[in-house]
Amino acid sequence: MTMIQINDDAPAVIVASDQTQSAPIVIAHRGASGYLPEHTTEGVVLAHAMLADYIEQDVVLSKDGIPVVFHDLILDDLTDAASVLPDLRRADGRWHVMDFTLAELRTLTVTERRSPSRPWKDKGNRFPLESGRFRISTLAEHLQLIHGLNRTRPHQAGVYVELKGPAEHRAASLDISKAVLEVLTQHGYDSPDDHIYLQCFDEAEVLRLRTELKTPLRIIQLLSQPADAAKLKTIAEVADGIGVPLSHVVTGKNADSTPQVTELVRNAHANALQVHVWTFRTDALPGFAGTAAEYLEWLVVAAGVDGIFADQPDVVVDWRTARRQQVNGGKSFRLLKERGQEKSQSEK
């Protein structure tokens, strides 16, 4: 990876350090999307300030083949495309990202998501729908921004890139994997030790990334359905981990208030796969979870997940910090107690 120097005396290499830090790694889901419209550069800055370990970039290609950071393949729920460029609507009545050049995408304003099906929308605590003038940015711009923040702030955030709709891109004669890997290489991401994950739902594309395109980067296979031990073994041949819904790991609460935990994490770890779960939202906790802290305790301590995607990454970071202090405080107390006992015995 490209060397990024924090100061003149510091080592100028950023490498992944997940193995040396306590779980979970905290992934800012589409940036700090619980506070600002998703995938905006403003949300990236806030996520970095909140000390997220990784900041997510969902990537779609523009009509002219430029990787842009945008979650959906269509623009309807997150932009004003309908009013700004009405003539680019398809026969299906939707505005598709791949039908717009980068220059055209730059004319749109990004908003908070309009979809009425999101349960947290009823809470009224998300960014106002029609406020601000947020823009669509390219993957390269997001990487440059994060690199700059890594240089100027005492925190090193990684990137977590999702390849959206490889099959849909192929139908439009676009190769999203090649385009994204080219941008990543240009910005120094070319080693499994680099502070980056690639993720994708398309299992055939994940295999292609590893075999045909031969990327050395760490890959997460996204799964929408639960995976058994046999499937996990197959995934482990090409991927470094799995990304799954929270409900695949903790399914409910027992009568004695203990969590109902599946075998997924245990089976994944048996195949040397990390488990990253999505999406933790303080304003959309499952009904069986009393508090955010309790739910995080179940996910991390009881279930053993390795990473958490969060709309409010600061909440998970703060919980992790408090837990580390609690654990380390307990160790310090035990150590002092043991040393005191040793001293007493030596004086006898």
Predicted segment positions?
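Phosphate-group recognition and catalysis centered on beta-loop-alpha active-site segments
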Residues: 1-348
